[in-house]
Amino acid sequence: MDFFEDNNPFSGSDNRSASSAVNVEPKVEPSQHQGSSSVKENAISQPNESFQSRNMFFQKDVDSVVDSALDPNGIVITGAMKAESGSHIVYIIKLQDSEIHHRYSEFASLRVQLSRLYPTCLVPPLPDKHKIMDYLINVTKNQRMSRMLEERKRLLQLFLRRVAQHPILGLSEVFRKFLSRHVSWKEVLHSPPISCLPKDLLKAPPADPSSKENAELYKELPIPSKTLVPRDNYDDVGKNFLMLEDTLQQYSIVAQEESNLFNQIVLSNSKYCLAHSTLGAMFNALSLSESGKLLTALEKVGQANDHTCLASIDFMHNFVIAVIEPLQELSKDAKNMRHIFIFRKMKFIQQVMVEELLTRKKSFLHLLERRERHAARLQQAIGEVDGDVILNRESEATLGVNNAQTSRSTIPEEDPLFNDEESKEPSVPLMGTDQPLENYHDGNGEQTEECLRDLRHNQSQDFETVSQDTSLTSVTVLPRTIRDVFDRIRFVLNGLTDNNVEVSRHNNIGRTAESVTHLTDMLLITTKDVAFVTDRVNFEFQRYQDTHRQDLNRILNRLTDSHIDWANRNLRIWNSVQESLKTYVS
């Protein structure tokens, strides 16, 4: 956090008198402010005491701070001082009988962590690290640093008091540890609940972002976009929040512009003060050359100009504290409240996204189930058709056997091999012993095989002749070769994967059903979160409105009081001058 570091106003100056003008208190020993607690610390620092007892004492001190009710008015920042190690500035916080030292970067870190721990709570703003007004006014570096430290002490004290007044932030364990002198802030940052916070608050329960309950479901929640859902698709509550968000944005801009205008008034008054200071010096110089009543009158006019200058300086100081700084606080509060509305909008969009995902998954699951039923009906119908085909094939096979037997009995009369000429040959007698009949069948088989061989040889010769005559042989063979290669690759890939269509379909249905169950649980938690965030935002906005009315009323009253006081002071001075002039004229 280097960008939070403080600039040390004492690092570039060795002038003791100048540094003493910065209202920086000297370092005070803890024994001067802690009363009876110093006895405990001396007992703890004894070398014979164990480390365990020391830790028990520290934990007891932390628990007492956490359990005790904080008085917001009891939190006071008494001063600023240079840190023992380093060149940064630490601010001294006095709470009851203890003192705590924290630097500006730790205040900024506290605010960031409170915003993360309580995303639906309005965390008070911090003063700006640097302001342009500090450099526009022609003052020295020490005067600028003195003014900056005074302003920071005042606004940091206001920040702590506002946090303590909050009904939720004031009871935060992190805030109580920040106000404990025995707890290191670095240890707090690296310990629960801060160490358990996720990177994105949209993936955590808004009631307790550090909770691990339903952590797996929250991790899988989608991250929405601000413009994902059109304005017309919001419900009445969402449209009301959108209107309030736009109103707060405009109000923040207007409050910032008013603050800038008041800063211009301060600059004009600074010139006005300088002019009256110059006039006072000139009238005082003129009075030196006069005497009598004229001398008195000139001195009165010069003193009136000097008093006008002083009254204007006091007016500007009160004006900055009572008007400009509260207006800047109001502008920052409006921005922070708008961010809370944006957080609620993002949670609502997240719920809409989960609903859409669940609807698509349910539709896809219904489609898969319908396909599964259709496939089951087809499989049943195919089974019935296969049964009929098997019966028909069995009947045809039975008829084929009977026909074969019948044809086999009539072969001697119909077979062309048994022609008239061969039947008359004496070497193949139709009747006689078995040996001539076996020789006949052997001869007939050899003739049939020889005919088949001649037929195959002729077909192969015809195919080779056609292949040699055509000119598209390479074109027809190459695609078949490539197709064979891809068929083999596809066969290997199908062997590596689950190529069972039925099993794949069942697995897909199972995965989709599991996703539907998962999304249903996510929808339940997002719906619950949106309801919680809506209630908390309504409560916080109501509290913001009440505080805003009080602050704005106080600003207007202080503004009028400052003008009236400035005018009354000037009126008294110039009335006395008028009386002196009447005496001189008479």
UniProtKB/Swiss-Prot annotation:
The modification Phosphoserine is found at S19. The keyword RNA-binding does not apply. Residues 69-185 form the PX domain. SMART domains: PX. GO terms for cellular component: cytosol; endosome; endosome membrane; phagophore assembly site. It comes from the Eukaryota. Residues 1-46, 401-427 are annotated as: Disordered. InterPro entries: AH/BAR_dom_sf (IPR027267), PX_dom (IPR001683), PX_dom_sf (IPR036871), PX_Snx41/Atg20 (IPR044106), Sorting_Nexin_Autophagy (IPR051079). It is a peripheral membrane protein. A 1,2-diacyl-sn-glycero-3-phospho-(1D-myo-inositol-3-phosphate) binds at R103, S105, K129, R152. It is found in: Cytoplasm; Endosome membrane; Endomembrane system. GO terms for biological process: autophagy of mitochondrion; meiotic cell cycle; protein transport; reticulophagy; retrograde transport, endosome to Golgi. Residues 8-22, 31-46, 401-410 have a biased composition (Polar residues). May be required for cytoplasm to vacuole transport (Cvt) and pexophagy. Has a role in meiosis. The PX domain binds phosphatidylinositol 3-phosphate which is necessary for peripheral membrane localization to the perivacuolar punctate structures. PANTHER family: SORTING NEXIN-41. Belongs to the sorting nexin family. This is Sorting nexin-41.
